[in-house]
């Protein structure tokens, strides 16, 4: 009953029509004692030569009536081809520069960043006179130390990395 009430409240907030909301997963692992996070690079010609400050957690918009965690899991799978399992730790939502609110969950896991299989989108390229072309939503992925990830990730998502470190520190898994 309480869970239904919370879900209904979240849905009212998400679909009030004023702010866009997306949901994603912050996948993490430990390699030789170093905390690493999994980030994706947006596909398409606009992002092709951009690197620092454009990477993201795998995420996407929440469909009407969809549970935000279910949306996060769906989006991760659509953008990477992988479906992480484990304990999903809800993080405090962050607001990106665009105004979009990102709901995120941290989950420990592993996947081969070189083996991602992303969904695609269609775009007229070049704009105004080019032809319709298909591009991957995500063109590459990588595992990064938290310090390196702070350089790579969108400014508005950097707070998710700090939250992950705090959660893991509280569990005695990170210094």
Could you describe each region identified by the protein language model?
Residues 17-56, 105:
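N-terminal strand-loop-strand
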Residues 56-91, 145:
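The catalytic Nudix box helix
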Residues 32-34, 44-47, 63, 98-99, ...:
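Short, charged/polar surface micro-motifs in flexible loops or helix N-caps
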Residues 147-175:
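Charged phosphate-binding loop/patch that engages nucleotide di/tri-phosphates or the phosphate backbone
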């Amino acid at each position: 009953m309480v869970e239904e009430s919370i879900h209904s409240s979240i849905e009212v907030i998400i679909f009030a029509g004023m702010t866009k909301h997306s949901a994603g997963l912050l996948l993490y692992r430990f390699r030789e004692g170093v905390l690493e996070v999994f980030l994706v690079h947006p596909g398409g010609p606009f992002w092709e030569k951009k690197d620092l400050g454009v990477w993201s957690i795998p995420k996407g918009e929440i469909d009407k009536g969809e549970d935000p965690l279910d949306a996060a899991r769906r989006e991760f799978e659509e953008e990477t081809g992988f479906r992480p399992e484990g304990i999903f730790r809800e993080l405090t939502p962050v607001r990106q520069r665009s105004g979009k609110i990102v709901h995120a969950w941290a989950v420990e896991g592993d996947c081969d960043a070189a083996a991602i299989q992303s969904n695609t989108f269609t775009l007229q390229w070049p704009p105004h006179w080019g032809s319709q072309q298909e591009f991957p939503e995500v063109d590459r992925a990588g595992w990064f130390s938290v310090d390196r990830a702070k350089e790579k990730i969108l400014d508005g998502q950097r707070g998710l990395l700090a939250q992950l470190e705090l959660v893991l520190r509280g569990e005695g898994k990170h210094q």
